[in-house]
A protein has these predicted regions:
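Short, highly charged C-terminal tails/helix-capping segments
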Residues: 141-148
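Amphipathic, Lys/Arg-enriched alpha-helical patches that create a basic surface
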Residues: 128-137
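Short, ordered beta-strand-loop transition motifs
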Residues: 25-33, 56, 97-101
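Short, aliphatic-rich beta-strand segments
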Residues: 104-108
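Charge-rich, low-complexity N-terminal segments
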Residues: 1-51
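A short acidic/glycine-rich loop-to-helix N-cap element
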Residues: 112-128
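Short, internal acidic amphipathic alpha-helical interface segments
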Residues: 62-103
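Long, continuous compositionally biased terminal/linker segments
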Residues: 39-69
């Protein structure tokens, strides 16, 4: 396990003591000692899967599944146009359609070395920046994707 995950585990333990079992942990077996924390972020009537990826690199990132149902190939050009606009307007995130499953994802990359890593920054970013942003744009994305 990596140093960032050790710090995140302490935060998760504190959250669990308070009754918040937001995250489950998955340890990977790779050269970067990757640990993925699975959670959910509520946006309107949707509970969006969230993956916080901590590894032995200069970055940490959060991936949010904007859709959990594959979008139709026919709407992908319109969706990509909408996502490109969002990518230009909101610099903190990157939206894309995965070629693996045709779902829409949002990645938020955070530079942070082991020594400076603060897990509360990750959680606060999700709750205070990403969640309000998704409240503003999620319905429009689903509409363009033909899922609303």
């Amino acid at each position: 396990m990596n140093k960032k995950a050790e710090k995140f585990d302490l935060l998760v333990a504190d959250l669990n003591k308070g009754g918040n079992t937001w995250f489950t942990k998955e340890e990977m077996t790779d050269d970067l000692n990757t640990v993925v924390y699975h959670g959910r972020l509520d946006v309107h009537e949707h509970s969006l899967p969230v993956f916080i990826v901590l590894e032995d690199s200069a970055f940490t990132y959060a991936r949010i599944a904007i859709t959990t149902t594959s979008i139709d190939e026919k709407v992908i050009p319109a969706v990509l146009k909408e996502l490109n606009t969002l990518n230009q307007d909101y610099k903190v995130s990157k939206y894309y359609v995965s070629v693996e499953d045709n779902n829409i994802y949002m990645d938020v990359s955070m530079p942070c070395l082991n020594e400076q890593f603060d897990p509360t920054v990750v959680v606060n970013l999700l709750l205070e920046v990403i969640q309000p942003h998704l409240y503003a744009v999620h319905k429009a994305i689903l509409k363009v994707a033909g899922l609303a």
